[in-house]
Amino acid sequence: MARVEKVNVEWITKQRDYTDTDPIETEAIKRINGSLSKAFYGTIKIQQNVFGFFKLDKKKRVIDAVHVSNPPVIRYGKGMWLDIPKKALLILTERRLHIAASIHAAEHAILSLMPNFVISMPGDVRTECKVALKEFAQKESQRKRPARLTFYDAKGGASGSGISTKAFEHVDHLLKQALARVEACWCEHGCVECVASELCKQANEVMSKAGSSVILKSLLNMEIDIEALPMGPEEYSPAGIETVILAQPVPPRDRALLQEVGVKEEDFDERETATWNEVQFWDGGST
């Protein structure tokens, strides 16, 4: 029960929160044509954590930041995800391109093209947008996120709306069209015609257009011209403490019920689990 009191003040509030979207059960796997990478479909846990709010004046300027402590809001839905190959992380690290910004940009590029394959409105499918306060911080974060592109149905409850199911079915075309859109756009850092989204709750602050092409090409098993990539850190993606770790396989509830398309049994072998320490960094050092 919440109690509301009417007051006259010169400010409004804006919620401060972040959302973790994590697959918890694989229901179907689809091999991406011409690639060793796979797309997965299944149950997604969406956990929203509200940690405070801003007070904004009439010109929407921040005049105060207030911290609150609330329990997380957790719900479940259906969605699709793609685990990013280690080779992409190696290249991004070598060129000092921000990994979280690259993931965020690639997710936006794919999201923008979903209406090409299923009738939907902007916002019907969502992703985990990256928060600049965390991604560009100069101190270690306890909230490490997997190197994964994740998309989930915003409507339909635990059963989903079916839109992400269609995206899963057409994932090969989605990836190719997203890459073509990124490469055809003449902007330098990203815009709404390629990797930015007008619906991004974090105002597209964490973006790497160059990094998104590395991720998309690696998923499609396409050749990547490393020397043609810019050397970071990029102007709008300053280097911070790494917040991304290798994605771990999400097991099915029952292998007998798992739908597999061009995937061998060993795809869920324990050997596929990995840690970030397996990746060699550009400087030959550690995390």
Where are these regions (language model features)?
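Extended, highly charged accessory segments
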Residues: 1-287
